UniProtKB/Swiss-Prot annotation:
Class of the enzyme per the UniProt entry, highest EC level: lyase
Keyword Lyase attached: yes
Family annotation (Gene3D superfamilies): Transcriptional coactivator/pterin dehydratase
PANTHER family with a match to the protein in the record: PTERIN-4-ALPHA-CARBINOLAMINE DEHYDRATASE-RELATED
A biological-process GO annotation: tetrahydrobiopterin biosynthetic process
Annotated TM spans: none
CDD domains the record matches: PCD_DCoH_subfamily_a (cd00913)
Pfam families: Pterin_4a (PF01329)
InterPro entries: PCD_sf (IPR036428), Pterin-4-alpha-carb_dehyd (IPR050376), Pterin_deHydtase (IPR001533)
HAMAP family according to UniProt: Pterin_4_alpha (MF_00434)
Organism listed in the record: Cupriavidus pinatubonensis (strain JMP 134 / LMG 1197)
Native organism taxonomy: Bacteria, Pseudomonadati, Pseudomonadota, Betaproteobacteria, Burkholderiales
Protein name: Putative pterin-4-alpha-carbinolamine dehydratase 1
Keywords: Lyase
Enzyme Commission number(s) of this protein: 4.2.1.96
Amino acid sequence: MSEKLESQTCTPCRGGIPPLERAEAEALLVETPGWTLADDAGRLERSFTFRNFAQALEFVSGVGRLAEEQGHHPEISFGWGHATVSWRTKKIKGLHRNDFVMAAKTSELAAGMTQG
C-alpha cells in the first residue's frame, strides 16, 4: 500500500510540466474525500464549517502554517463559522499532485478540530 497523501511532502514544482489530466485528478480525488474539482479540473476546493469565527480563524491560521511548512499556498476565504480552501499550482495553471497532498493535510487539520 502506498503512503497516504497527508503523510507525504510537497515536491518543488518549477513549472514547465503539464497539469494533471482530468482522469489523473479524479483518481487522486478518491483519496481526498469531501474535496471537489472546480474550474474544469484546474482547481481543488472544499468548504468547512465551524462553531464560530474564532474557530474558523484558528483553522485558517493552521492551514497557513501548513502552507509555509510545505512551500505551497492556497486561496482561502472565511468568515463567521466557515472557510473555503482552494488548491491549485499557479506555475502550471492547474493541478499537481502537491495540491492533493495539501488537500489531505488540510482535511486532517480540520478533522482534529471540532467542526460546527
